[in-house]
């Protein structure tokens, strides 16, 4: 055994092997503001492959040679300039029923409370049986938004995995209900902390996060000005077998997929919405977005975009990232609520 890794706000590795611990500690001193992960090595440790990343810096891969020389091999997104994009912190806030909800707050680098509250994106993760980590956001959405002047809250709402059994099981049967409360309570907390402008709140999510955005559209007391729903589930009754190829998971965990169904509540739609989905998406097929759009388009300003040749899961082609980021930015600037909102 060389060491062990604990899943906290990020993955934290502790080496019990003396040589590996020495190498790891040395690398952390060279890259003090980044996460350092050793990914491979040769016999004798004369060659050690490691990765660095932070909330502002995408994963970059390096080779430590003879323990005294570092050769940088490449970055996941080399076109991103080397400057700070995000001030990030792990937080906790109380839901309305008292449950403690973890979250990640990301702010434009250098923002101070004296600068005034920011337009804020509530950004629930997919899954919902998943979670977010601090450090580089692999989707690229968070640093993109903060670079445009938005604050971002990533609530680890009930149902999230990897943050304790109590939080995980509290989401059973609560789609669109208490799981949605956690998002709205996070928005309220951001406002109370002076970070969020209550008149410029947005929800943006993908996959389950897209469901949450659709649920916000029909939620009578939703605090958001608009919703961006990527690759959403919108009809729980028709979710069926599309969400997992694992039969045991469908039978066991499928029993927990219950709650408020957006498609059955479109008569209460009152939040403008952008829906987008890849035309090759088989996990959340495009009919979810299409059917929801047809039901709400005469009640609220609604836009539907089918992205050519895009599947559900990343990695996508470069053009898919460019197209969807332009779509999101344009919608926020021009169509979010009456007149749009702008981060900067």
Task: Report residues per predicted region.
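Non-catalytic accessory segments flanking enzyme active sites
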Residues: 4, 11-111, 133, 137-140, ...
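Cap/lid segment of the alpha/beta-hydrolase catalytic domain
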Residues: 79-199, 206-207, 212, 239-242
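Short beta-strand immediately N-terminal to the catalytic nucleophile in serine-hydrolase-like folds
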Residues: 203-205, 230, 276
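Short glycine-enriched nucleophile-adjacent loop
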Residues: 210-221
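Mobile cap/lid helix-loop segments that gate and shape the active-site cleft of serine hydrolases
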Residues: 225, 231-271
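C-terminal catalytic histidine-bearing segment of alpha/beta-hydrolase fold enzymes
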Residues: 290, 297-344
């Amino acid at each position: 055994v060389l060491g062990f890794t604990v899943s906290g706000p990020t993955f934290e590795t502790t080496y019990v092997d003396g040589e590996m611990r020495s190498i790891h500690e040395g690398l952390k001193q060279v890259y003090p503001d980044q996460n350092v992960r050793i990914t491979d090595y040769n016999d004798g440790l004369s060659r050690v492959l490691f990765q660095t990343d932070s909330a502002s810096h995408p994963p970059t891969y390096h080779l430590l040679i003879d323990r005294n020389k570092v050769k940088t091999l490449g970055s996941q997104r080399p076109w991103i300039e080397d400057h700070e994009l995000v001030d990030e912190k792990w937080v906790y806030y109380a839901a309305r029923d008292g449950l403690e909800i973890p979250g990640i707050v990301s702010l434009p680098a250098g923002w101070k409370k004296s600068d005034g509250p920011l337009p804020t994106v509530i950004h629930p993760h997919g899954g919902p049986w998943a979670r977010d980590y601090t450090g580089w956001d692999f989707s690229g959405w968070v640093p993109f938004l903060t670079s445009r002047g938005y604050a971002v809250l990533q609530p680890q709402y009930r149902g999230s995995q990897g943050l304790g059994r109590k939080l995980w099981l509290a989401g059973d049967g609560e789609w669109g209900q208490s799981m949605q409360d956690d998002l709205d309570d996070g928005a309220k907390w951001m406002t109370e902390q002076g970070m969020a402008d209550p008149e410029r709140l947005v929800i943006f999510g993908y996959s389950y996060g897209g469901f949450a955005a659709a649920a916000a559209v029909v939620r009578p007391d939703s605090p958001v000005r608009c919703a961006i729903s990527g690759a959403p589930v919108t009809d729980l009754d028709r979710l069926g077998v599309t969400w997992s190829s694992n039969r045991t998971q469908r039978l066991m965990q499928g029993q927990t997929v219950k709650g408020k169904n957006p498609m059955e509540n479109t008569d209460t739609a009152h939040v403008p919405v952008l829906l987008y989905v890849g035309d090759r998406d088989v996990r959340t097929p495009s009919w979810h977005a299409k059917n929801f759009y047809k039901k709400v388009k005469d009640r609220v300003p609604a836009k539907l975009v089918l992205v050519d040749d895009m599947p559900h899961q990343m990695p996508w082609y470069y053009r898919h990232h460019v197209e969807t980021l332009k779509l999101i930015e344009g919608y926020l600037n021009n169509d979010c609520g009456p007149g749009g909102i702008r981060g900067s």
